[in-house]
Amino acid sequence: MQIFLDSTDTKVIADLASTGLVDGVTTNPTLIAKSGRPMLEVIAEICDLVPGPISAEVAATTHEAMVAEGRKLAAIAPNVVVKIPLTRDGLIACAAFAGEGISTNVTLCFSPTQALLAAKAGATYVSPFIGRLDDYGFDGMDLIRDIRAIYDNYGYETEILAASVRNVTHVKDAAIVGADVVTIPPATFSDLFKHPLTDKGLEQFLKDWAGTGQSIL
């Protein structure tokens, strides 16, 4: 499973990307607004930091305007993925981008039938929002399971990008049910490394090693 960072903080992205474990980055208008920086500048910088797919979202609501904005975003760098909402106009734009060879991430997916339409429109990625479904009393992982089954039934190549991921358990569950990608906040990425028994075991190993008086170097 690929791991993307959901962030526009270029310093944090650079730091976490240095692990070699970051496969891509997703952004959205809210994160861009929080950055306080020009969108095109932020996306260009992220594209330089991470060679993998970088999702940049359109702000338009009509398919004509989405296509115009998407073309401008795609021109920033070869690894830009144009992010579009799962609306009727969004899917019309998605099909247009597919015809032009522009990668897309269809976002705000909350049902299997929406995901089916995204695949039929030629989406590169579809982003089911797991945490938001959980907030309303649904099981977001059921959505990923259903999408996985539909895509496997018909051989769709659209990748399932689990979004609105809140914690390590979400990451684990998304991997189990077959998500191709998970996008997570930097804090959750850092939490993936942690387990109290790892810390406890390392502490004991180092204590025992120190008692030997040896040095490897």
Curated annotation (Swiss-Prot):
Q: Which GO terms describe its cellular component?
A: cytoplasm
Which major enzyme category is it? Answer: transferase
Q: Where is the active site?
A: K83
Record-listed E.C. numbers = 2.2.1.2
**Free-text function comment from the UniProt entry:** Transaldolase is important for the balance of metabolites in the pentose-phosphate pathway.
Cite the HAMAP family for this sequence: Transaldolase_3b (MF_00494)
User: Would you tell me the protein name for this molecule?
Assistant: Probable transaldolase
List the source organism: Caulobacter sp. (strain K31)
